[in-house]
């Protein structure tokens, strides 16, 4: 039986902070049958509480809005940094729900998604946000979001939820029936793969790919039956990584036709922590993060990884880099600016 999605607000004490696996849900099977409801413009918003400690609370994702960094997390917190992660300020946000993912298509326009199937949008680099969409009856969170341009985007979430917009989020359409997902497996991650298309991964090893920017989807047989928490395209055409429970990591160089398991081995042996998030850095290297303070870097397009475990063993949910080569990590205990390996300066 799937446990309540609301337990995801305590993910710092359990599995992955970045995504929701099959063990985090136990809602009625009819939840996905509720009609889509766009947030009413007349609704009086409840804004996130401003707090000096917001940067130390549970944070789940990080993105670049041009030179600015934007992070999202619990209680509707959205934080901004204009000095590459040294200091943070809090944005004004019309929700107190947990926000799970954020995506910017350029330095001004971005979207954040979260619980209550909420979609928030910003047109000023994350300084202010408006609520574009929510569905209170669905009782399922959105877990990832992707935009092709200012108009066309997709959001994915629990119970196989797939939303599409063609007008920058002014209207969202439930297009879950585009997926061959009869069991309504939770969809955890979506990514664009260079010169190939879009790829979605989720619960029970589910995988879907699209060669036409999300208009149609093909279900494919993957290499793993456990939950996959995310997917990322590499710098090479048709090449991607899918990652999930217990350190399971797989690489494909043909857009999912075939897969190779990638071993992650640290000083104490094979890594068995859940993998939560990944990023492609400007130099083409890949960085993965997960539970147990795990930070992994690849400089050969994901064929091998060097594994580093932070001494604090915190659960990490998101990662990106800055122009100086340092990493910005988010997760348990907030946001951290670290060395290129993921270590704090005192650990180097």
Please describe what each predicted stretch is.
Residues 31-348:
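Residue-level hotspots at or immediately adjacent to binding/recognition sites across diverse folds
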Residues 13-26:
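Bacterial N-terminal signal peptides
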Residues 3-16:
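Bacterial N-terminal signal peptides that target proteins for export
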